[in-house]
Amino acid sequence: MSLVLKKSIDDVALKDKKVLIRVDFNVPVKNGEITNDFRIRSALPTIQKVLKEGGSCILMSHLGRPKGARMSDPKPEKGVRGYEEAATLRPVAARLSELLEEKVAKAPDCLNASIYVSKLKRGDVLLLENVRFYTEEGSKKEEEADAMAKVLASYADLYVSDAFGTAHRDSATMTGIPKVLGSGYAGYLMEKEINYFSRVLNNPPRPLVAIVGGAKVSDKIELLDNMLGRINYLVIGGAMAYTFQKAQGRKIGISMCEEDKLDLAKSLLKKAQERGVQVLLPVDHVCNKEFKAVDSPLVTEDVDVPDGYMALDIGPKTIHMYEEVIGRCKSAIWNGPMGVFEMPCISKGTFAVAKAMGTGTQKDGLLSIIGGGDTASAAELSARAKNMSHVSTGGGASLELLEGKTLPGVAILTDKQ
């Protein structure tokens, strides 16, 4: 999939236009404070482009998973339909104001914002409240999603999509609005995301390594199946590695294992061999008897995990082996951590992979792509994110791209003639 044949924000006049931009400001908030503003910062180039060209921005996003209310529900005496304090975009408006160094107005109800929109002048920014406060945003009933899309579309002259993180959703704000307006344009973040993934999937510098981790093989079946026809090396870590290792007859102690996926693991390993893909699995492990942080976890001498122990991270020999493979590759794509990186004593494997990719990018020109979600969080936590070619803002969307699927939020955008 590529954005080469889709129109972008550079292909349309923005002066004096009210531009409705679907962004992904689904950021972590604790006690009313944003703990990671990466997604907000990633949307700035598109917002600044509109302002520079003399347009005004109407921003819409979701945050969290509020229960939501229907458009037809009675309006409460105070407040707005579906409102939940934990999911308000108020902290986002404050942070965006700081980043833009100008006031960002906020409409408290995304579907009753006409008065706020009418006051917009050149260079103004308006943030609508959480679109998921209305259940129509994610409704599977086309008429419900269309009803919400029509209200939002009425605010604007143009629709721009910069929400790669929700591009895999067929929703009112991702596909409904461009359908109503008859056009939709890609923002700079959307364009950047798709083009990086397109490059690594369709025409990567070789050798190409896929580093795949996380808890379950079942979560990565389609990704692995699609990538085996494209990669030279497959590096496996995380809890999912132990399903593969048990399938090979190794001892895994009480490590997590999907017993019903052992035959699938064998099949994937056989397919990799048939396609000439070298698969690397852990050769030593950092273990504990319980799923908790300890000061001195057990590090095994070899590939087998002792009885009564569970593997929580890859060991030093495995780290060295994985670093060597990354070092000999020209492209690397990483989806899923190597272990429980949130616990400092068992974060070394994940952080070592991040360091190897960052170093390879800066010193040897490695094309390095981080596939969003937990992997992006790990790269940020390891302070290596800035060294990568690209850190995706989308977990589910990047996973579906790697699985070879078409993203509805991209497919709906206007084709170039």
From Swiss-Prot:
Main subcellular localisation: cytoplasm
Gene Ontology MF annotations: ADP binding; ATP binding; metal ion binding; phosphoglycerate kinase activity
Alphabetical GO biological process terms: gluconeogenesis; glycolytic process
A family per Pfam: PGK
Enzyme nomenclature, EC number: 2.7.2.3
Cofactor: Mg(2+)
Catalysed reactions listed for this entry: (2R)-3-phosphoglycerate + ATP = (2R)-3-phospho-glyceroyl phosphate + ADP
Full protein name: Phosphoglycerate kinase, cytosolic
Organism of this sequence: Leishmania mexicana
